């Protein structure tokens, strides 16, 4: 597994890798208050659906330790503003709500315990959520490894890598496992405008792991697909819903259509924590809109005229008809089969 971690727990403190600075600097943010973690989620210091789910769990643990509640019931009540603050950080990724639901269920089921014991349970649950994610990603990688044939070329989008998760990544997990097994393959990484997660993060982490990776502008993908230079695509997901529609980084939909047009398989790596069976179709997924400055500047340098109007959706929805298969820690499924999955609680 790559040495660099998106988030870690040391000496009763959460440390978050500030991914805004990659690849130029590797710096960790020291977080001793839940608001610091919430801010890091909002400003993309930490990003990737599984990683922000883990960060949410750690935020709840940090908050609970700082509260001076006299009973478990009082602790639960005092945590309600924390839950709401975290839910409001980023609306599209389901993992934040998933982590909060899990923490709330733990607390509700143990309100009879002394508050000190409940706080210990909350901390241990955060550790468990973090460790589980690493194992889930590895299992996704083991299933997806079947698609990695000797000499293949795979295209990926945004960053569904180790730095978007607790470790291994979702879409990148089979890449790390293929590398370990000595399978020769190439990765094409789309730069992923406007925040350039593919260029800054995916290219960075794959190069660091010694994986053969080539960076392209997003609008080069179609040309490579038409020339037959890509064997398959694999991407992550921030929320996959009951009918198999997939919300992921803006531009994923475009790539899926190009793959369909050129008869190239399009796979989605989805931990069950990112699957939301309460929503029937992608049309109902809330889509986050972010600051115009992400589009009009790159690393603080203006690239557009002052006052230009901007549309900046952070995510788009890929309809199930463009998805060849969804790879979870429970196996590989057709999009139409997702509604039958028993999800991880």
Swiss-Prot record:
Catalytic activity: 5-(methylsulfanyl)-alpha-D-ribose 1-phosphate = 5-(methylsulfanyl)-D-ribulose 1-phosphate
Pathway: Amino-acid biosynthesis; L-methionine biosynthesis via salvage pathway; L-methionine from S-methyl-5-thio-alpha-D-ribose 1-phosphate: step 1/6
Naturally occurring in which organism (per UniProt): Thermodesulfovibrio yellowstonii (strain ATCC 51303 / DSM 11347 / YP87)
Gene Ontology MF term list: S-methyl-5-thioribose-1-phosphate isomerase activity
Enzyme Commission number: 5.3.1.23
Keywords tagged on the record: Amino-acid biosynthesis, Isomerase, Methionine biosynthesis
Amino-acid positions noted as binding substrate in the UniProt annotation, renumbered to this chain: 47-49, 90, 197, 248-249
Protein name per Swiss-Prot or TrEMBL: Methylthioribose-1-phosphate isomerase
Site entry: Transition state stabilizer: 158
Active site: 238 (proton donor)
Function: Catalyzes the interconversion of methylthioribose-1-phosphate (MTR-1-P) into methylthioribulose-1-phosphate (MTRu-1-P).
InterPro entries for this protein: IF-2B-related, IF-M1Pi, IF_2B-like_C, Initiation_fac_2B_a/b/d, M1Pi_N, NagB/RpiA_transferase-like
PANTHER family, per database record: METHYLTHIORIBOSE-1-PHOSPHATE ISOMERASE (PTHR43475:SF1)
Gene3D superfamilies xrefs: translation initiation factor eif-2b, domain 1, Translation initiation factor eif-2b, domain 2
